[in-house]
């Protein structure tokens, strides 16, 4: 795997550490960084902070790679913002393309799920979204147990984070 851009490779390796924070939130590394740098938020919405360590600053710099290479898998919908997050199974953007409607202060996907039936609120979905988006949403299967939402890697076909797939994403983000 001959690397032509060391900056993109470095971002990919750092993104692997960021992916570890996301995929193993109970690991010692994830808990230490969370306690110090994002105690009230999650890694994807974290800020660099006032005087960050070199390690944190470096990992935080890889957030662009992680954000571009992930999308949400719907569980209970509590962590997924309807308009801002990537959560639809549409590879073009993974985001809702329907015009944004006033849906409260912070509209979450959970507001589209009926807690009694553990299924989509079909009429609400059809009334809010364009037919294309509504169809995509209603095709997303929901687990009856409504587990936590989870991030999945979309950087390759297998859905597994690799430095190679992160490198290709980093190449598109790095200024030459």
What are the functions of these language-model segments?
Residues 1-176:
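A helix-boundary/hinge signal
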């Amino acid at each position: 795997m001959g690397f032509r851009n060391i900056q993109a490779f470095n971002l990919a390796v750092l993104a692997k550490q960021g992916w570890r924070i996301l995929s193993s939130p109970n690991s010692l590394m994830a808990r230490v960084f969370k306690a110090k740098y994002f105690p009230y938020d999650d890694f994807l919405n974290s800020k660099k902070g006032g005087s960050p360590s070199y390690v944190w600053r470096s990992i935080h710099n890889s957030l662009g790679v992680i954000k571009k290479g992930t999308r949400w898998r719907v569980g209970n919908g509590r962590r997924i913002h309807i308009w801002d997050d990537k959560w639809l199974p549409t590879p073009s953007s993974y985001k809702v393309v329907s015009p944004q409607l006033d849906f409260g202060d912070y509209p979450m996907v959970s507001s589209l799920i009926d807690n009694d039936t553990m299924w989509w609120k079909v009429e609400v979905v059809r009334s809010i979204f364009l037919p294309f988006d509504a169809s995509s949403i209603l095709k997303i299967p929901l687990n009856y147990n409504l587990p936590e939402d989870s991030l999945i890697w979309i950087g390759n076909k297998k859905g597994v984070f690799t430095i190679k797939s992160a490198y290709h994403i980093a190449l598109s983000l790095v200024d030459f």
